[in-house]
Amino acid sequence: LIFVAHPKTKPFLMIAAIGAGILIVIVAILAVYATNSDNFRIGRITTWLDPEGHSDGTGFQVLQGLYAIGSGGFFGKGLGNSTQKLGMIPEAQNDMILSVICEELGVFGAIVVLILFGLLLYRLMFIARNAPDLYGSLIVTGIFAHIALQVILNIMVVTNMIPTTGVTLPFVSYGGTSVLFLMTEMGLALSVSRRIKLQTE
């Protein structure tokens, strides 16, 4: 939010670049020493690097999710016809829900879900850019960042692009508290949107 509110972006970009470099070095060091540690966080990294080697343990959920995505094909098996969710994918209703969507509705269904998220994020960006004051703009920018980050992290976990994080898919994954907070955020965004007065010629 400070990045959005501040007129100069160069210092923040430099900090982000330095942070990314440090993160890469840390991940490389962890990858080297991961095999000698029993820490479950390190175990997530080793599972991410070699899920097949941990198929009986920590890699089971990731592999079953990937099998579900692969078995769905382009149009899927049909709504409600997933077999992987019936005990094969642990906690399929939570952070692995996208793999079930891919199995039942295929790549086409997953693309539709991503397009809907894209439209929501586009609308939030529009509201943030046209908000009548900085306070409203920052509120909606925070909501945008929260939802976008959750969607990106969830997709990357399901496709095994990053280690498992436990981040759920907004509005789709199981969880009443999550939905309550997301709906509160949508209410705040709509409140800011109501006060936008676009100039018409």
List the model feature ranges, each with a label.
Residues 12-17, 111-112, 139-140, 180:
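Hydrophobic alpha-helical transmembrane segments
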Residues 107-151:
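Hydrophobic transmembrane alpha-helices and their immediate junctions
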Residues 1-9, 118-128, 189-196:
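Structural signal for the C-terminal ends of transmembrane alpha-helices
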Residues 150-201:
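A juxtamembrane structural motif centered on a specific transmembrane helix
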Residues 15-110, 132-135:
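Hydrophobic, glycine- and aromatic-enriched re-entrant/interface helices and adjoining loop segments
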Residues 35-37, 93-97, 121-129, 155-161, ...:
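Transmembrane helix-loop junctions in multi-pass membrane proteins
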Residues 3-15, 134-138:
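Short loop segments and helix-boundary regions at transmembrane helix junctions
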Residues 88, 100-103, 143-147, 175-178:
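Transmembrane helix-bundle signature of multi-pass membrane transporters/permeases
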